[in-house]
Amino acid sequence: METSSPALSVAIGVLAVLLGMTGFGVYQAFGPPSKALDDPFDDHED
């Protein structure tokens, strides 16, 4: 079995981190923690 190149390992690691951060952001925006978010447009009605 051939060993994979270090560049491929780094690329997969970076991809995993980016996907994790994206998933966490979507969870924060639309999941249960989103109930604690305030809408600044609702706070300052004209």
Swiss-Prot record:
Where is this protein localized, as stated in its record? Cellular thylakoid membrane
Superkingdom per UniProt: Bacteria
Keyword Membrane tagged: yes
Write out the transmembrane intervals: 7-27
* UniProt entry keywords in alphabetical sequence: Membrane, Thylakoid, Transmembrane, Transmembrane helix
How the protein sits in the membrane?
Single-pass membrane protein
Q: What NCBIfam families does this protein's entry cite?
A: PRK13183.1
Could you tell me what this protein does?
May play a role in photosystem I and II biogenesis.
Name-wise, this protein is Protein PsbN
Question: To which species is this protein native?
Answer: Parasynechococcus marenigrum (strain WH8102)
Q: What lineage does UniProt assign to this protein's organism?
A: Bacteria, Bacillati, Cyanobacteriota, Cyanophyceae, Synechococcales
- Name the encoding gene, please: psbN
